[in-house]
Amino acid sequence: MSALLMLCAVLLLLGTPSRGARPWEPCTDLRPLDILAEVVPLNGATSGIRMVQVEGVRGLQFSATEPRTTSFPASRIFSSCDFFPEEFSIIVTLRVPNLPPKKNEYLLSLLAEERDTLLLGLRYSPTQLHFLFLSEDLAGAWQTRVSFWSPGLMDSRWHTLILAVSQGSFSLTTDCGLPVDIMADVSFPPTLSVRGARFFIGSRKRTKGLFTGVIRQLVLLPGSDATPQLCPSRNARLAELSIPQVLKRLTGKPDDNEVLNYPYEADMKVTLGSRPPCTKAEGAQFWFDAAQKGLYLCAGSEWVSVLAAKTKLDYVEEHQSLHTNSETLGIEVFSIPGVGLFAAAANRKARSAIYKWTDGKFVSYQNIATHQAQSWRHFTIGKKIFLAVANFGPNERGQEFSVIYKWSPRKLKFTLYQRIATHSARDWEAFEVDGEHFLVVANHREGDNHNIDSMVYRWNPSSQLFEANQSIATSGAYDWEFFTVGPYSFLVVANTFNGTSTQVHSHLYIWLVGAFQLFQSFLTFGAADWEVFHIGERIFLAVANSHSYDVQMQAQNDSYVLSSVIYELNITAQTFVKFQDIPTCSALDWEFFSVGEDHFLVVANSFDGNTFSVNSIIYRWQGYEGFVAVHKLPTFGCRDWEAFNTTAGSYLIYSSAKEPLSRVLKLRTG
């Protein structure tokens, strides 16, 4: 008997007379509790929930603008007492879309509504599955997060996950494979009160983080690990413990002696031709794209792919010439929920521009005073939306400040929020560790001294400001990149110049005991950018080397033509090892993106020693061959690449550090 069940028994014995006392009962039934069925009536007719069919399998898709429609009080299943089980399993069968980097979506949350406190949550990102729960002791309460690295969800296929929790042990099994076990420092609480709490399915009570995939099974099994009940399975990706009645049939295949029926046959309407509008009137109707051989369902206001041929990148064409205020050192593409898609340009001269995607193109939206801006970084803290600019030059008073701006929902503009003293700042990186928010700045130089400290800043929830947290010695720092591997957090810096040579070590740091500690060093040549990316369960780091120079030797033209390097994480050796050298021309940026099932890297080649008119190259992942060049893109002084998606397709945008013109390119697929 678990500690929690014993506690419930003691409380019942203490709270009632011994004579005639009613028998002990657990807080919930010990049978599988179908949480998904709690928000779906038998006929499936719930506002905000739509039944779809993918790969011949039924699932539910949430399109609610008000997440409360897919919620229910915890008291509905916690019938005997108000404590969440100490040992349990959560079983999920789902199909998830590709997510942008650093985006998270919630599968499940349990909230104490009066305090709006997250008691328990399950969310995923492009690389991790996170289990969150509230921990408390005499010192107070805090959020604990247990993260499982790369469950391999981003392949547009069905998967079944089993999360088992017991006595400080957390285990994740994907498609009945080998479990990943984590022994955490903090155990799941034995007395997590759910009094007055509410379950939210597919959200955290907000539209931000709303689950955009398809879900078929969401079950809580109190008291035991569900893995032996589900595995092994003949169809591990659809292993089933309990699903809502409306999803029972795998509609792609009839049972023996049964006529195959189509649940939507009476109402189904299929539109042919070019993309029709998707409005309330077309809800639950289909559109067949004969050219692309794809079948789409109108869900909410978007056409959702139900069946599609594999998407392949055919070629790249120019979509827009974006005239900028001046030369552009960096571009940041981001979206604001309910407002739209934006691109912030870091312009060399006194004003930088923010553009909004309107009618298929970027148009000027807001101008902000900057001082030789190098880059922008978009990030969020709760409901707050921020943009931080890295200023390379001083202001009119000779002071060096980089600035954080905050989005005003009332003014629909970014307004000044906080100034931070920096030294020829090149880059900001925003990240979260253990529920705390951080910013790190790449300080390039102070006067002629390139060997200075860059600074990590921590968000203070009380003052609502960023405060200096840790200094890290850098040499001409140009870029920071944050990433996680399993429960570990990493930060890598691109060091460019130490005052005499560009042949310097760039360093990778790991978060340990509340600070970043040196983990690994790489010999780099004027490193200007790091890009981390995942292909399946493999993790890569690509460095952009820009220049091989030493004051002791005469610089030659070919010192700009050198190899940039891709490293791969060797899990066994616990280190990154060289995977591939790629010839580049003063490379300043890497950008990773995917089209369908294919993966690509595009490099910003800026200078070959003679001219800034050089080709930037798109490389395609070809497995054993590594990355192979597939497209040559004419660019002029190329500085930065960003990939982004809209309902109309996929795009790349690059900035030029040598002319006031950036270009938007459309990825044509077939």
From Swiss-Prot:
Residues 1-20 form the signal peptide. The keyword Signal applies. The keyword ATP-binding does not apply. GO terms for biological process: hair cycle process; Notch signaling pathway; regulation of Notch signaling pathway; sensory perception of sound; tooth mineralization. GO terms for cellular component: cell surface; ciliary membrane; extracellular region; stereocilium. Pfam families: EPTP (PF03736). Glycans are attached at N498. In the organ of Corti, expression at postnatal day 1 (P1) is restricted to the basal region of the stereocilia of inner and outer hair cells (at protein level). Expressed in the organ of Corti at P1 and P7, in cochlear ganglion, stria vascularis and vestibular ends at P7, and in inferior colliculus, remaining brainstem, cerebellum, brain hemispheres and retina at P1, P7 and in the adult. Also detected in adult liver, lung, kidney, intestine and testis but not in heart or skeletal muscle. Disulfide bonds: none annotated. Its main location: secreted. Residues 59-278 form the Laminin G-like domain. Keywords: Cell projection, Glycoprotein, Hearing, Repeat, Secreted, Signal. It is found in: Secreted; Cell surface; Cell projection, Stereocilium. EAR repeats lie at residues 314-359, 361-409, 413-461, 465-513, 515-571, 575-623, 626-669. Plays a critical role in tooth and hair follicle morphogenesis through regulation of the Notch signaling pathway. May play a role in development or function of the auditory system. This is Thrombospondin-type laminin G domain and EAR repeat-containing protein. It comes from Mus musculus (Mouse). The lineage of its organism: Eukaryota, Metazoa, Chordata, Craniata, Vertebrata.
